[in-house]
Amino acid sequence: MAGRSMQAARCPTDELSLSNCAVVSEKDYQSGQHVIVRTSPNHKYIFTLRTHPSVVPGSVAFSLPQRKWAGLSIGQEIEVALYSFDKAKQCIGTMTIEIDFLQKKNIDSNPYDTDKMAAEFIQQFNNQAFSVGQQLVFSFNDKLFGLLVKDIEAMDPSILKGEPASGKRQKIEVGLVVGNSQVAFEKAENSSLNLIGKAKTKENRQSIINPDWNFEKMGIGGLDKEFSDIFRRAFASRVFPPEIVEQMGCKHVKGILLYGPPGCGKTLLARQIGKMLNAREPKVVNGPEILNKYVGESEANIRKLFADAEEEQRRLGANSGLHIIIFDEIDAICKQRGSMAGSTGVHDTVVNQLLSKIDGVEQLNNILVIGMTNRPDLIDEALLRPGRLEVKMEIGLPDEKGRLQILHIHTARMRGHQLLSADVDIKELAVETKNFSGAELEGLVRAAQSTAMNRHIKASTKVEVDMEKAESLQVTRGDFLASLENDIKPAFGTNQEDYASYIMNGIIKWGDPVTRVLDDGELLVQQTKNSDRTPLVSVLLEGPPHSGKTALAAKIAEESNFPFIKICSPDKMIGFSETAKCQAMKKIFDDAYKSQLSCVVVDDIERLLDYVPIGPRFSNLVLQALLVLLKKAPPQGRKLLIIGTTSRKDVLQEMEMLNAFSTTIHVPNIATGEQLLEALELLGNFKDKERTTIAQQVKGKKVWIGIKKLLMLIEMSLQMDPEYRVRKFLALLREEGASPLDFD
C-alpha cells in the first residue's frame, strides 16, 4: 500500500503514552496495525497503532520518548505506510533492554524482580513492534522506568515450525513481541537500580583479582597455605557474578583477623591483599589513631571509615565495589568491654560502634575489614563471631620451605645484579635459620650486606670507601654465617647463652647412671619428634643437691637441636610477685607453642614455688599455674618437651606434682670410690701419681658426693702447692661428709 502524508501530533493522554503505540484516528487506521513512518528518505521507524477519538484525522500522535527517538517535532510532515511483519523471520526470540528510573527524584534502593518485570512487559506490549535503539516508558509497581532497546534476536525458525530447536538465532533490527519472547533487562550505566531475578543480563564486571600478581612480586613468602585459606574464605564468593551469589543466598565474608608473633608478615599480607585486588586503595588505620580526646570523636572516626562504603551501597546495591579497611594493632581499640578502668567507657563505645558498622541493623555487603594483632586474647569476643571478623588466621613462624621463599625474595635483587657470591646456598641458610620470623630473615640479609660492605671501607683516619674493591663487592656465605652467629638471634629461637652457663664444664660421664640419664633423655627427645600420639612429653630429673641435674637437663635440651629452647629458672624471677611469676612462666610456654618443636627446662621447681621446710611455706598460685602448664597440650601440629629438675621429690609428691610429669628419672650422686676415680681421670686435674694416692684411700669404699660439689673441692685443693694437693683434697672430702673413712 502506498504511503500517505500526515502530521505529527502530541499524545492525547498519559495512559496512551505508556502504551508505546502511535495514536491515530479510527477514520485513518485500525488498532493493532503496524505502520512505517518516514521522517526523511533515509530515516524510517516502525510503530504499532492505537486509535483514539480525540486525534484529528490526518495526524499521528506520538509520546515524548517516541518523538525523541524518531527526532520528530509537533506539526512535522511525515510519510506513513502500513507495514506487515514476516512471522517466520521477525518474531522476537530474545530482546535485551537497558533500564533505569525515568526520573532521578524517584530513585530508591528497593530490589526489583526482573522475572516479574519481564512477564509484565510481555503482557503490556504483546504483538507490538520494537526496533533496536527505540526508547519507551514502562510502568511497573507504580514506578516509571525509561527503557532503551539494545539488542534483538529473532526466534529460532525451527520452533515456529513445531520442530526441535536448531540453535540458530539471527540478530534483527526490527521485530514483533509474541507471547513466548524472552526479555532480559540490563541496568543502565551508573544507575543505582537494584535488579534481582534471572531475567537480567550478566553484567560485564571487572575481575576482582588483579591479573598480573604473583607472590614473589608481592614480596610475600612462606604464607601460601594461609593466603589460599584467606582467598577461599574471603574472596572466592566475590569472584562469582552477583546473580549467582544472589541465587545461592550467599553472604560475603566481611572480616579477617590476622594474628601471630611479631615480624611474621601480618601487616605485609594485609597491605598486599589491597594490591592483589582490583579494588580501590584500602584504608589503612593504626588502631590508636582512632582514639580522640574529644567526646564522641573516636566513634565518629569509625563512622567516617565506613561512610564511602555506605554511600556506594545505597547508590549501586549489589554491584558496589569492594571497600577494604585495614586495622593495624586492632587490640588497641577492641579490648574486651568492661575490662578498662575508669568511668568514661570510651573503649567500650568504640567497640560498640565498630560492631554495629560491620554487622548491624543496616548491613553492608561491600566491605572487608582486616584486623591485625599479636594479642588475640585481648579482643572482644563479639567482634570474632561469624558475620564480623569470622576468618581467624594465624600467621605463624615460617617453616623451612617458607624461609627458603623469604630468603629468595630478599636476595633476588642482589642475585639479579650478580652481587651474591656463588658459594651462598639459600637452602643451607633456610635450614640453619630455624624459628626465624620473616622480619628476622630480612634483618639477617641486611646484616650480611653490611658485613660485606664493611670489608671495602678503608681503615684510616677518615671513613672512605675503597672504590677499586667496591666494584667487586659480593656478599658471601661467610657474611651470612657471621651474621647468623653474631648479629641476628630469633626471638622464638634458642639463645645459647641461656643454657651454655649450665654446661660450661661439660658433662662428666663418671659411670652408668649418667649415661643412662642421657640415653633416656635422647629417647624422650625422639619420642617428642616422631610420635603423633604424644605431642607433649614431660620428664622430671630428681636427685640430691649438686648431682648435676640442671647440667644434664641443659645437655639433653642442647642435644635435641630443637629450634626453640628456653630455661624457666628462678634466678630470672628474683623479687617477682606471685602473679608476675605466673605471667613470666605463661609467656615462656606461650612462646613455645608458636614453634613447631620446643623444649622448656623448668629448673629448680621447689625454688620457683618459694618452698621452705620451716612452716612449711610455698606459693599455691605458682603451683597451680605450673600444674596447668605442665599438663596443657600444645596446639595442633606443635610438639613440646618439658624437662623439670628438683632436689625435693618428696615435697613434689605431697603437692601431687609428680603425676603431672610423664616420667621421672633419678640422678644419683657419686656413690663408690671407683666412680670418684673415673670422674677424677676424666677431669684430668690430678697427675697419675696423685690419682694413685687417692685411689689407695677410696678404692672399694663407699662415698657420697655430687659432681658439682666434687668440682668445687678439686678446684679448691688445686690452689695449694703440688705436694699438699692430695692431702687437702682428701681432707675436704672428709669434711664434706663425702666418706665415713678417715683419710691419712
UniProtKB/Swiss-Prot annotation:
Which residues does the record list as Phosphotyrosine (modified residue)? Y259
Q: Which domain of life is it from?
A: Eukaryota
Q: Which Gene Ontology terms cover its molecular function?
A: ATP binding; ATP hydrolysis activity; ATP-dependent protein disaggregase activity; identical protein binding; ionotropic glutamate receptor binding; metal ion binding; PDZ domain binding; protein kinase binding
Supply the alphabetized keyword list. Acetylation, ATP-binding, Cytoplasm, Hydrolase, Magnesium, Metal-binding, Nucleotide-binding, Phosphoprotein, Protein transport, Repeat, Transport
Which compartment or compartments is the protein found in? Cytoplasm
- InterPro entries (UniProt xref): AAA+_ATPase, AAA_lid_3, Asp_de-COase-like_dom_sf, ATPase_AAA_core, ATPase_AAA_CS, Cdc48_dom2, CDC48_domain_2-like_sf, CDC4_N-term_subdom
Q: Establish whether keyword Iron-sulfur is in the entry.
A: no
Q: Which GO terms describe its cellular component?
A: cytosol; Golgi stack; midbody; plasma membrane
Q: What is its EC number?
A: 3.6.4.6
Q: Where does ATP bind?
A: N505, G506, I507, I508, K509, W510, P545, H546, S547, G548, K549, T550, A551, L552
- Look up the record and name the cofactor or cofactors this protein needs: Mg(2+)
- CDD domains to which the protein is assigned, alphabetical: RecA-like_NSF-SEC18_r1-like
Q: Which residues carry this modification: Phosphoserine?
A: S207, S569
Q: What is its main location?
A: cytoplasm
List residues binding Mg(2+): T550
Keyword Magnesium listed: yes
As stated in the Swiss-Prot or TrEMBL entry, residues carrying the post-translational modification N6-acetyllysine are K105
The entry's comment on post-translational modification says: Phosphorylation at Ser-569 interferes with homohexamerization.
Q: Which SUPFAM superfamilies match?
A: ADC-like, Cdc48 domain 2-like, P-loop containing nucleoside triphosphate hydrolases
Q: Which reaction does it catalyse?
A: ATP + H2O = ADP + phosphate + H(+)
Query: What's one Pfam family here?
Result: CDC48_2
Please give the subunit comment from the record. Answer: Homohexamer. Interacts with GABARAP and GABARAPL2. Interacts with GRIA2. Interacts with PLK2, leading to disrupt the interaction with GRIA2. Interacts with MUSK; may regulate MUSK endocytosis and activity. Interacts with CDK16.
The record's function comment reads:
Required for vesicle-mediated transport. Catalyzes the fusion of transport vesicles within the Golgi cisternae. Is also required for transport from the endoplasmic reticulum to the Golgi stack. Seems to function as a fusion protein required for the delivery of cargo proteins to all compartments of the Golgi stack independent of vesicle origin. Interaction with AMPAR subunit GRIA2 leads to influence GRIA2 membrane cycling.
What the record says about family reads: Belongs to the AAA ATPase family.
This chain belongs to which protein, by name?
Vesicle-fusing ATPase
Q: Give the organism the record lists.
A: Cricetulus griseus (Chinese hamster)
- What gene is it encoded by? NSF
